[in-house]
Design a protein with these regions (language model features):
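SAM-dependent methyltransferases
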Residues: 101-128
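Donor/substrate-binding cores of folate-linked one-carbon enzymes
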Residues: 1-109
Length: 128
């Protein structure tokens, strides 16, 4: 975890990709916890980093259905594939000024490019 001093120096400029549909399942072992809770959906979130663990404004999320035969390994692999789609797409959107963050508020001016990169399954605003 990064210190509050470090985070404050880069406020609003540090991203994290997290393997869950935040705010659910902050921290480690997300796939095992999802399976243990018999959830039907899982996914990935991109958010701005704050001093609190896996907290901060959500920029985007992608979800998938948990298959009846999923194991921690298979679910992890499928979520990782979503991470590989979503993270670079969000970074591109930030670089091209399609997403704006003011405090805790996130506003997207254009989601079409991000949707085309990710196959259209991105959630804006992020899932509740």
């Amino acid at each position: 975890m990064l210190s509050e001093t470090f985070i404050s120096r880069f406020d609003g400029r540090v991203l994290n990709i997290h393997p869950s549909l935040l705010p659910d399942y902050k921290g480690l072992n997300t796939h095992a916890r999802v399976l243990a809770d018999k959830k039907t959906h899982h996914g990935v979130s991109v958010h701005l980093v704050t001093a609190a663990l896996d907290d901060g404004p959500l920029l985007a999320q992608m979800k998938l259905a948990v298959a009846p035969n999923d194991t921690e390994t298979s679910l992890s692999e499928r979520v990782l594939a979503l991470e590989h789609q979503l993270y670079p797409a969000v970074i591109t959107a930030l670089a091209e000024d399609f997403v704006h963050v003011e405090g805790l508020n996130v506003r997207w001016s254009d989601t079409s490019r991000l949707r085309s990169i990710t196959g259209g399954v991105v959630c804006f605003p992020p899932l509740d």
